Amino acid sequence: MDSSEGCTDMDEPSPGFILNMTSDAKVRSVVEQIDRLSNITTSPPEMGWYDLEFDPLEDEGPFLPFSAYVITGTAGAGKSTSVSALHQNLNCLITGATVVAAQNLSRALKSYCPTIYHAFGFKSRHINICQRKVPKVTQSSIEQLQRYELARYWPTVTDIIREFMRKKQKGQYSSLSQSAFRLLCRMGGANLWTSNIIVIDEAGTLSSHILTAVVFFYWFYNSWLDTPLYRNGAVPCIVCVGSPTQTDAFQSVFNHTQQRNEISACDNVLTFLLGKREVADYIRLDENWALFINNKRCTDPQFGHLLKTLEYNLDISPELMDYIDRFVVPKSKILDPLEYAGWTRLFISHQEVKSFLATLHTCLSSNKDAVSTKLFTCPVVCEVFTEPFEEYKRAVGLTHMTPIEWVTKNLFRLSNYSQFADQDMAVVGTYITDASTQITFATKFVKNSYATLTGKTKKCICGFHGSYQRFKSILDGELFIESHSHDNPAYVYSFLSTLLYNAMYSFYAHGVKQGHEEFLRDLRELPVSQELISEMSSEDVLGQEGDTDAFYLTASLPPSPTHAALPTLVAYYSGAKELFCNRLALARRHFGDEFLHSDFSTFTVNIVVRDGVDFVSTSPGLHGLVAYASTIDTYIIQGYTFLPVRFGRPGGQRLSEDLRRKMPSIVVQDSSGFIACLENNVTKMTETLEGGDVFNICCAGDYGISSNLAMTIVKAQGVSLSRVAISFGNHRNIRASLVYVGVSRAIDARYLVMDSNPLKLMDRGDAQSPSSKYIIKALCNPKTTLIY
């Protein structure tokens, strides 16, 4: 008897899967401990002290109690993904320290996760509010530390609470019972006033005062609204997740007189919790710290040993030095755009990124025959408003500064994640009026190159490009419908119906091109579902000439989602999908399996692509399915369009009519093959001086995307890259955190190269890795939780 009979072959589980399963029991214990911390209660602090007249620099308010749990570990060890266990088992507010971290969590949890800044009410106008320089005095208690941290951030805090008091009614939840409050928590998303468990991913990138700000806003909001959390004295539990050795926190103060940023290192939230003895004792760090040990992103044992060496600041063995030498290639190969095509270059400085992109664009522009990697330019417009700019110049004593000089010195501040600092762009024109000065830059993009978003951006999905088989797989899987139907499913079914309606012609066109009369005859004879039939009877179609697709003589246009009921839209979509699949099966029978993999495109309107990048149409505008684009997904740049795109904003376009005429919408393709237009990014630059004077100086319009061809190591944090080429350049005394972040982006050690051995250039010692000694101490402490 065959021993395999009745057995099912199973794939061997991956090392990453095994590592995740072995950590399951310890993760459960972490959840239980955080649950216990969240049940701690106290006498509610009297928040009436903290009014708009209060100033912690001069006044002493009541101490705001809190608890904390720290989750740290090597890069790729599963810290962020383990947050899903908290999300599934506890009522908690999940946040990220950055937009990338928040979007990463949102995708993993399939639930909206804000940044911690958004959670406590931070707005764009607060970016340029200067932090106060608080005199440093000896802080010997947790109360003194909290007061000091709160005083640093108080100008921003007061502006946020002023707006909150204006928008929220005092005592709004005073009459709400405990059961009604629990129902409210389940109905809506988590907030600082619906949960006392606040999770912050990538907390090591936050300045230490943000921890105190979160604690303050938790108590203030719950006190103002008079929630059951406040009445019961529920102490907030702040869960801080991150890797203290791969992150640094910096604070920047803009010097208006010299027009430059003054950047200095500061304590981050993790080192604040680990390194401040008063804080560590208060939160009982030994019992409330979990360390993830093994890297699950890249499971190569030697690579994991490298990360642990950097994590714990261990001595570098000759064997490890030899291992890193295997990744070293000549610097000229990494800087040559023709080498390592498709790999992501990582650099230390923005100038190095910009130089590489400029070299790449020069190579592409000299190759006129390259269609798939065509280089094209789009304008970026900065508009400086004359009146507030003149007032600002007088206030800072720079009366001779011109708008162009100001824009040149402030480009890096005009867009998220220093997009302007990385772009290969140059001034191509200025337009001066009495009201403003418009400065136009030309920025370059490469067709079919990968890019990520630099902020929260709307997209209008307007088409699909790929193969017939790929499109059919998407329709059969219905994942697209599931992932986009949470707001209004009617629009999703209407969108797909429009794509299907317009896609039918491709079968007829292929038959005509091939001169295949039998296929065209069979195509006409395919039955059309009753849900698609227009008011014109089938008899009216008989006798029509065969020079057009009979489907369009028979079928009605897809019903509008604003006028048709959902069942009608679903019925039309089902009928259109059935007919598309029948036509595809017919084409496969006549033309063979290769037809399934042939080129296929469909759009919501008739589109023609000129010069390979310019999407044009005779339609007055471009419509589609509007959604927010994910900042962690990678998009392929396809080109641009000057067609007016409807992004679903009731107030109209975010750009002025003048800027809209100058700036097109960038067209991209996602990993599934769907084509979308991205809404242009609008940045309003507001300068806030120390005295509180505010000047609305500038408005800039750009495209909100950043090339994945090259980026800084700092920007790459939190991103997994399939192919990585790192250039450490001519830098010396490289920070250990930069080396750690750079090499740990790789998901496969076989696809990692670098231009030098960073271990020979890296600063060593406790000063460079201050948290390593605390981590090593924790590894030897039986009270801490180790997760392998």
Swiss-Prot record:
SUPFAM superfamilies: P-loop containing nucleoside triphosphate hydrolases (SSF52540). InterPro entries: DNA_helicase_dom, HSV_HELI, P-loop_NTPase. Keywords: ATP-binding, DNA replication, Helicase, Host nucleus, Hydrolase, Nucleotide-binding. Signal peptide: none annotated. GO terms for molecular function: ATP binding; helicase activity; hydrolase activity. Gene3D superfamilies: P-loop containing nucleotide triphosphate hydrolases. Its EC number is 3.6.4.-. It is found in: Host nucleus. GO terms for biological process: bidirectional double-stranded viral DNA replication; DNA replication. Pfam families: Herpes_Helicase. GO terms for cellular component: host cell nucleus. ATP binds at residues 73-80. The keyword GTP-binding does not apply. Component of the helicase/primase complex. Unwinds the DNA at the replication forks and generates single-stranded DNA for both leading and lagging strand synthesis. The primase synthesizes short RNA primers on the lagging strand that the polymerase elongates using dNTPs. Possesses helicase-like motifs and therefore may act as the helicase subunit of the complex. HAMAP family: HSV_HELI (MF_04030). Associates with the primase and the primase-associated factor to form the helicase-primase complex. Belongs to the herpesviridae helicase family. This is DNA replication helicase.
